[in-house]
Every structure is written in structure tokens, then in C-alpha cells.
UniProtKB/Swiss-Prot annotation:
This is Inorganic pyrophosphatase. It comes from Komagataella pastoris. The gene is IPP1. GO terms for cellular component: cytoplasm. Mg(2+) 2 binds at residue 121. PROSITE patterns: PPASE (PS00387).
């Protein structure tokens, strides 16, 4: 199963879209890519939205047909994550698990907050990647960010092909082989919105990163929530459910690919120099 990307327009522009292709045909990274690459070995597929050390706030579009990756906007302007010293941009390869959904109608019994209406967020702690890459990963743990009153899980994973992958099998292995990384992850998620005038984010479980078993339970809950969504048992709101592979679902539409423009890649547009500024946050390490 081979995945590739179809880029429309230049990165860092409002027009830019990155579609995912499987064997040359456009698929939805939200609905068509299987959650598991190999369920018996607990190997999952992850869609990379933001490569580490970059600033553009890229995400799978829930509302557009076939859910391309695009840059988030606010009041018509492209959004970028600020650099919070000593970090630069996103500190991990950041993305999402396909075929998962954090249901905004359900309050989690332990976080006491509803889901954030997005696919499940993933932090891949290995080496550099690219937007639209479909990585095969193994789960190590999960943090529960409380983002503006919503439960926003952050699943910690490692690419199975990463040199460190054989040594990392649960969350305690991360501290052993990558000391300081979980503390830095907690700090970054806590402070990264402060330069934009927002308050510090909070965590459930006092910021503790839960282990692999707990993370797997969260993933299963979000998988079941997505299944209800895609089969029409939960109202989708503005979420586009169009897919090209799930024949038994109401929104199965293989012909939808014909409306996707042909690839038109271009060199990235220049980013304003202000995005390179470092912000020094009081109370951060």
C-alpha cells in the first residue's frame, strides 16, 4: 500500500492544499486510510500534518471534500505557531490518526471535558518528516491537554523505522532513552498559545503522560466514535464524510476524485520575518 501526496499551489498561501493519494488515486486522510497498518502487531498509520521545527499551522480539513491538508486561518490570514524559547515551531512531527474522532458530544469521565471535534492528535517523536507523509508508528503513551475547555488528547508515538524504535515500547522508555523530551512536550503544549495573547493551557492528570495501555484505550474510544460518525449514527455537523473506499457507508463516492485538481506544486511562499521571532515565556524552563 503506497501513499503519496498531490500538492496544489505553494505552501504558505491560502490556496495551498495537500491531498493524499493511494496508488495514484486521491483518498481521504480522515476516512479512507486505515487506522491500523498491522493491527496484530499494533502498528498504526499516522498522517503527518506539521513536520517538526516548522511553524505553519497545518491540519486536515474536516469541512472540505476528501479532507486535504491546508493551513489554518484566522480572519482570512494564515496562522503560524510562534517560537517559544527554547523551542522552534512544533517540537515534534505533528499529525493525526485516520479513522478516529474526538466526539464533542461526549464528556470523558476522567478529564471531565468534551472532545474537540477533531481526529486524534499524534506527536511522533522520531526524525524529520514531511506534510502528508503516512508513517507507520507504534504507540507509547498519551497526554490529556485541556484546550479552551475541551479534551485534546496528544498521543505519543514513534515511527517503527526510527533507529530508536526497538528500544521504545512504553512511556517509561521515552524518559530513559530521550531524557527531558516528555517534560519539554508538556511545557510546549502549556505555553505555545501565550504569544498570541491566550492563557496557558492546562492538563488533566496534573500533566502526567499516561502509559501505552491507557493510550490504546483512548484510541479505541475515538475509533468507535468515528465509526458512528461515518455510518451516520452521529450528526457530522460541518464535517465532510466523503470517502472513496468505504463502500458500505452513506458518503462513499469514488467519483469525488474527479473534482480534485491536478498537481500544481510550487516553491513555498516567503514567510514574514516576524514568524522567526523568539518569545520568552515567564515560568517556562
Amino acid at each position: 500500500m503506497s501513499y503519496s501526496t498531490r500538492q496544489i499551489g505553494a505552501a504558505n498561501t491560502l490556496e495551498n492544499r495537500v491531498f493524499i493519494e493511494k496508488d495514484g488515486q486521491v483518498v481521504s486522510p480522515f476516512h479512507d486510510i486505515p487506522l491500523y497498518a498491522d493491527e496484530s502487531k499494533k502498528v498504526l498509520n499516522m498522517v503527518v500534518e506539521v513536520p517538526r521545527w516548522t511553524n505553519a499551522k497545518l491540519e486536515i480539513s474536516k469541512e472540505e471534500k476528501l479532507n486535504p491538508i491546508l493551513q489554518d486561518t484566522k480572519k482570512g490570514k494564515l496562522r503560524f505557531v510562534r517560537n517559544c524559547f527554547p523551542h522552534h515551531g512544533y517540537i515534534h512531527n505533528y499529525g493525526a490518526f485516520p479513522q478516529t474522532w474526538e466526539d464533542p458530544n461526549v464528556t470523558h469521565p476522567e478529564t471531565k471535558a468534551k472532545g474537540d471535534n477533531d481526529p486524534l492528535d499524534v506527536c511522533e517523536i522520531g526524525e524529520r518528516s514531511y506534510t502528508g507523509q503516512v508513517k507507520q508508528v507504534k504507540v507509547l503513551g498519551v497526554m490529556a491537554l485541556l484546550d479552551e475547555g475541551e479534551t485534546d488528547w496528544k498521543v505519543i508515538v514513534i515511527d517503527i523505522n526510527d533507529p530508536l524504535a526497538p528500544k521504545l515500547n512504553d512511556i517509561e522508555d521515552v524518559e530513559k532513552h530521550m531524557p527531558g523530551l516528555l517534560r519539554a512536550t508538556n511545557e510546549w503544549f502549556r505555553i505555545y498559545k501565550i504569544p498570541d495573547g491566550k492563557p496557558e493551557n492546562q492538563f488533566a492528570f496534573s500533566g502526567e503522560c499516561k502509559n501505552k495501555k491507557y493510550a490504546e484505550e483512548v484510541i479505541q474510544e475515538c475509533r468507535e466514535a468515528w465509526e458512528k460518525l461515518i455510518f451516520g449514527k452521529t450528526s457530522p455537523g460541518e464535517i465532510d464524510l466523503t470517502n472513496t473506499t468505504l463502500q458500505s457507508t452513506p458518503s462513499f463516492s469514488p467519483s469525488a476524485t474527479s473534482a480534485v485538481p491536478t498537481a500544481s506544486p510550487a516553491a513555498p511562499a516567503k514567510i514574514d520575518q516576524s514568524i522567526d521571532k523568539w518569545f520568552y515565556i515567564s515560568g517556562s524552563a
